[in-house]
From Swiss-Prot:
Protein name: Lysis protein
Induction trigger: Lysis protein synthesis only occurs when the overlapping capsid gene is translated. Initiation at the lysis gene is prevented by a hairpin structure that sequesters the ribosomal binding site. The ribosome, terminating at the capsid reading frame, covers part of the lysis hairpin, thereby destabilizing the secondary structure and allowing the reading of the lysis gene.
Protein function: Induces the formation of specific membrane adhesion sites between the inner and outer membranes, apparently leading to host cell lysis. Lysis may be performed via activation of host murein hydrolases.
Lineage: Viruses, Riboviria, Orthornavirae, Lenarviricota, Leviviricetes
Pfam family, one: Phage_MS2_lysis
Organism whose genome encodes this protein: Escherichia phage MS2
Keywords on record: Cytolysis, Host cell inner membrane, Host cell lysis by virus, Host cell membrane, Host cell outer membrane, Host membrane, Membrane, Transmembrane, Transmembrane helix, Viral release from host cell
TM segment ranges: 38-60
Length: 75
């Protein structure tokens, strides 16, 4: 025969159970980290846009050169 003990729930006071609101002063480097991440993302966006524009331009020039050489060979 088993004897079962009722589970005792630990009662915590409401003051310790309640969380205090988030304050930026608690994490001073969080804002700096966020702004530096934003700068890195902006730099990457500008760099990649210039890189992709240049890449597309060089691909277009290669296609034009190929078409003109094929056109010269066929005539």
């Amino acid at each position: 025969m088993e004897t079962r003990f009722p589970q005792q729930s630990q009662q915590t006071p409401a003051s310790t159970n309640r969380r205090r609101p988030f304050k930026h002063e608690d994490y001073p480097c969080r804002r700096q980290q966020r702004s530096s991440t934003l700068y890195v993302l902006i730099f990457l966006a500008i760099f990649l846009s210039k890189f992709t524009n240049q890449l597309l331009l060089s691909l277009l020039e290669a296609v034009i050169r190929t078409v003109t050489t094929l056109q010269q060979l066929l005539t």
